[in-house]
Structures are given as C-alpha cells and as structure tokens.
Amino acid sequence: MKEYLKKISLVLATCTFLFSCDKFLEENPKDKLPEDDVCNSISEVYLNAVASLYTYVGGYSDSQGLQGTGRGVYDLNTFTTDEAIIPTRGGDWYDGGFWQGLFLHDWGIENDAIQATWEYLYKVVMLSNKSLERIDKFAENHSDAELPAYRAEVRAMRAMYYYYLLDLFGRVPLVQSSSPAMKDVVQSERKTVFEFIFKELQEVAPLLSEVHSNQTGPYYGRITRPVVTFLLAKLALNAEVYTDNDWTDNERPDGKNIKFMVDGNELNAWETVIYYCDQLKVMNYKLEPEYETNFSIFNEPSVENIFTIPMNKTLYTNQMQYLFRSRHYNHAKAYGLSGENGPSATIEALETFGYGTAAQDPRFDICYFAGEMYDLKGDIIKLDDGTVLVYLPWEVALDITDTPYEQTAGARMKKYEVDPTATKDGKLMENDIVLFRYADALLMKSEAKVRNGANGDVELNQVRSRVKAARRPATLENILSERQLELAWEGWRRQDLIRFGMFTRAYNSRPQLPNEETGYTTVFPIPEKIRVMNTKLVQNPGY
C-alpha cells in the first residue's frame, strides 16, 4: 500500500507543474494554460489529463479545495447557516467583519472569498476542458482501450465542479473550451446548467469503474461510478431549486412534475432520487456499524464513505484546517498540536441535538467537544491562569468580546478522530476528508419518499438505529433535523435549509435582512470584479 501511495504522490506532485492557474473571465490572465503537447503516450494522458485534476479537489490555501481549507466552498456552505458560527473573540476572528458577514448573510458583491471561490471552481472547469482537448487530440491517432474511461472521468470532474457553481451561484456561464473568446462567453439560466450537468453525469456513468474510490488502490480518491451516482441523486433531490430560474418569486416547480429519463423509464424527481440511492446499495455501500469509523485516523476501509479527499501527511499537501481552527489553543497544545479557538456550534444546533437533556442525541459527543476537556491520557486541560478548560456551549453568540466567556464559549468541532501524529499544526493528518457517504443517501431516499407521498420511516430509522437513537416518524421536519444530527460539520446545511425553505429565516444572533424573504441570498452574487471584466454577466437578483 505504501509503495502505491508513493507512486500516486509522485504523479500528483508532477502534475502541479503541468497546469497553471487560469482565472476564468480575466481579461489578461497572469498564467496561460500550456499549449505544448504533453500527451504522447497513454500513460502521459492519464498523468497530464486525468490525474493532474485531482490536485485541486483538496487544498492547502484559502478558497482552494472542496473541503479542508478556509474561505471557500465549505465555509460558504457552513458558516452561513444555523449549524455553525465563528464568534468574534476580542481581537480574534473579526477579520474585517468577514465571519460576521457570512453568518448575517451580509456578504456584498465585492467579497474576496466569494470571488476566490468562483475562480477556484472555474479554474478546475477550464483545466478539465483542456484535458478533454488533449485526450481528443491523442485519440486522433491512437485507439487505446483506456481512452473512453479517461474522457468520461474528466467529464465527470467538470460536471461535479459545475454542480458546485450551480449550487452557489445559480446562473453561470457554461464553457466547454479551454480558451473561450471573451465575447463568446454568455450566462446560462440555472435550469440549463442543471440539465447540462445531469445529462453529462448520466452519459459518463456507464463508462466508469464501480470501484469504491475511498479505498486505497488504483482508483483511490478518483471519481468512479458510485460518486457520479451519488451526485445524480443529489441533483434530483434539489431539482425543484436548481430548475427554478427565478428563485426570488417564492414559487418553485413541483418535483412530481420534473421528469427524467432513467434507464429507459420516465421518473419524477423523487423517484429519480430513490432510484440512484438504491443503485448505491446495489454497489455494496452500507452503514458502518460504528459511526466513528468513517472519520477515524485510517478510514480508508469504510464501506460507507463514497468520495473522500485522500490525506497523508508525508505524501500529500491536502490540509484539514477545521479541527485546528475550532479548538482552544491549550486544548490543541495538549494533543501536541495547535489551535485557533474559533468555530462553534450554534444555539440552534444545540437545541436540535438536545444538548444537556435526557434526550440528547448520541452523536453530540462524537461531533462536539463540550464541558471539561482532557488530553489523550485522560488528564485535565487547564487555561493559562490555571483554571480548568471548560467549553460552555450555551454562551455562544456572534460577538462575545469582553464577556467572561470570550475564550471558552461554544461547543467545538470534534467528529474526526484526533491524530496526535499530525503535522503542520495538526492540519496534515491521516484521516481522509469525507465528502459523500451512504448515510446521506439513505436520508435522501427517506426525504424523496415522503415528498412523493410515501413512507420514509425505514431509511430514517436505519440511520438513527446505528447510533441507538430512538425511532422517529419520517416527517419532513424530522428529516431536516436528522440531516443536521447525522451530517454535522460535513458541509450540507446551507443546501438543506434552502431546499426546505428555511435558509433566510431569522435565528439567534441573525436577524433577517431587508427583502431577504424573497430568497435572494439563497445564491451568492456574481463577483463584481468578474462582471467588470465581462459586462455580459448579469448580477443575481437582489444584489
């Protein structure tokens, strides 16, 4: 296994020099995609047109990577919700009002992090387009058996990145060339983008391997058929949102009337969700007997995780910054790591988990640090003044400066097993970062059944019984709560709240913005600097 990982790391290290970072829609980009031919053999096609793209799925700097880093996709999907909050703690975590702005939905059209996220996502789209052009050029004079699968994998990568653009920004340009002329770039309606992504994924799925890509081997960390199947289910689940070209009129299409052709049968959106979730079961995904297994230090053998970001502190540069950001300095120091004393659970999250009650959900102690803190040997952790470090979940608020709880308010992120051998302040750890997993698919199926007029109790309680939680009826309210209980800290809350029509409501520390009842904040603005470079791009309504 180690020899295999060494080979993969060499591939990825090499690839970082082969693709430069192209800022989509920039009038005079600093770096151009290389035009020299670097695909002269099938092995070079894999190296330079397929494997190279995976260097961007994870990351180590702000706004890069789908998860693991700050001020990017994950933060936009997490700290804009009732799940997590980063309180201002005196001189810490104000950062020009950035974190408060996210939580309050007051981000504006010139937000640097939103622009950097747009540029990151389009960078991978453009690199995927370049890869497809290289594969097609190679195929003109070669007929290697691997070519159709390689091309399908790159199309799937591009579709996945368009999925994130669709979810975050709504109406975006659909570009299928690596060097589009500025005058030819136009904005597509949200429904058009959705239909393109769905069609692409349906077409490539049969060409991809069914291997579980979270497990080490030739497909480790790659997009395989199960990853595409999960994405198809997720797209269908959100079809009412994604096919709505005007998300500010408080009217949505009905999922029962949104039709898809799936394996020769016409299915509505909810039937489509159920079909693809069932396909994951056929592909031998199941719940791990122990919830924690999915987030353990060596979680590659998980039969539940579907798509992960590979982590290896000696081979990869991918970072997991979230645990580092959340733990108090002395808490992290007790593990031999570092911390920034930041992100915490919201009051709403505590209430959903039933924190401190007789009915507290069993997953709370798995997902959060709360109360007195102990090191890995069981010794009490103390603050600098000699008092015991006690996290106080209920004292959390958006600004706790000059309060007695400035340093200790808030339940902190746990979920992933502590890797005491992690390096770079604890950000380079061995636990692979979980992006997609089967428990989510079961909850998607439960929701789809209920929305389609059927009973979703079986799937909901299959997830709950794994952690020995009491049975509940599968109402939409209970399903939304269960998604927070099961998927805390996994980056799904914003999407879930939007689908359930609850993203713009007021809650603790967050009043509703003027006109927010229209739903305009359910998508982010097209970055203003991007619009200046291309005046054809129309700003999203409300901004």
For each predicted feature, which ranges?
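Bacterial N-terminal signal peptides that target proteins for export
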Residues: 1-9
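Bacterial Sec-dependent N-terminal signal peptides
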Residues: 3, 17-44, 159, 197, ...
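Long, intrinsically disordered, low-complexity segments
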Residues: 20-21, 121-124, 196-198, 219, ...
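An aromatic- and glycine-enriched ligand-binding surface/loop that stacks and positions planar moieties
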Residues: 22-99, 172, 202, 207, ...
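Conserved, well-structured interaction surfaces
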Residues: 43-51, 55-61, 65-66, 88-169, ...
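Active-site beta-strand/loop architecture of penicillin-binding DD-peptidases
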Residues: 393-437, 542-543
